[in-house]
Amino acid sequence: MSDQRTIPAGKASFAARIARGSAITLAGFGLSNAIRLGSNLLLARLLFPDAFGIMALVSVLMVGLVMFSDIGITPSIQSSKRGDDPDFLNTAWTIQMIRSVILFALACALAWPMAWFYDQPDLLQLIPVSAISLLILAVQPTRIDTASRHMVLGRLTMIELASQFLSVALMLVLAWATGSVWAIVAGNVASAAIKVALAWLALPGITNRPRWESAAVSELVHYGKWIFLSTAASFLLTQSDKLILGRYLTMEGLGLYNIGFFLAGFPILMGHALIGRLMIPIYRENPPAHSPENFARLRRVRMALSGLMMALMVPVTLGGVWLVDLLYDARYASSGVVVVMLAVALLPQILTLSYDQAALASGDSRGYFWLNGTRAGLLVVLMLLAVPLVGVAGAALAIGLTHLLCWPLGARLAHRHGAWDPVHDALMGGL
């Protein structure tokens, strides 16, 4: 492909791009999670609950390595004035390759400590093979970030769905044939390979080549040093429950918790998907502090997102036990109570879910870090206090309290960038 293939700016209005991007993201998220739920249900019948527990630990390590080394390449490309400059993009791609190779080596080195700490010898083999996906993602093109920058999301969503569907099909065939947790590992590696191949073949944009431009490195590092710390904090926010519970629960118990978390967290995950794709471009092109019209536009988008998440969360909260009984066999019945507890605990997140994106769009990655760092530190402390006493219920309590207690900090950060909406918070908090 020629280097001259680029994504056109287009003449569609910004509102039309928001509407189209929202519709595509929602459709993609719905289909993706339908595939994920279907595969989860089928795998639950082909494998045993402890398989989901041990893969939760593998996933925690893979996610942790990626998040603890994230210097914010994607949000930097989305928000930078040089986000379409080939030298900037190629430098970002080169940094990504170096990082991925280092992550693979770290994953291999951490396999033995993980196996020893959780007393699971299988992790010695499962972790290094799973880490092959990190090497594959090293050559993922920046075309993905360019498509996201310009909210050209249709083809990007199709690539993600195709890679997920094909890898799940492979996973299910292998699980049926072997009854082994290795089926999940093979599917995850295949997913990375398919996504990278399709991105190179199907997305417009430059053909990335190794490049090291000092100015680009300086901008990426300056922006990314706080993103690095913020994503490390985000890892603790999203994965510390599994790390801590994995020490106190059996692998079967951890697997049941993981299934419950997936069902309870669906609306929040959908919100993150929409916000991650839409909010930085919205803040960048329509800064809410610049005019009442921009603020009103942002309020409409935020109200729609929060209302949608709330409408999905309430039925999950009320019907979690029934949902698990409907979808899973008797071995997984305990997940129903987990769904209810976690759905209640996750509700406070809706209040401030989009506020931190205002900081990123303004280049305030430091403020973004302090918010996430405070949340993470508080969550870990509450988890360590509550989980040994009451187990899974303690984890749910810690999650809920963390987001309630940190709401003033999120509101303060949003206010600094003209994005705080007390009307939104009062309405959603009242509900």
Name each region found by the language model.
Residues 124-131, 158-205, 223, 261, ...:
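Hydrophobic alpha-helical transmembrane segments
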Residues 76-85, 136-160, 182, 343-374, ...:
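Membrane-interface junctions at transmembrane-helix termini in multi-pass inner-membrane proteins
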Residues 68-84, 148-149, 260, 264-301, ...:
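Helix-loop junctions and terminal segments of transmembrane helices
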Residues 21-37, 163, 167, 184-199, ...:
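Transmembrane helical elements of multi-pass membrane transporters/channels
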Residues 42, 50-69, 133, 193, ...:
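Alpha-helical transmembrane segments of polytopic membrane transporters and translocases
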Residues 2-5, 74, 142-149, 153, ...:
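C-terminal transmembrane helix end/exit motif
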Residues 10, 52, 112-130, 317-347:
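Interfacial segments at transmembrane-helix termini and the short loops linking adjacent helices
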Residues 2-14, 18, 154, 158, ...:
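Interhelical loop/hinge segments that connect adjacent transmembrane helices in multipass membrane
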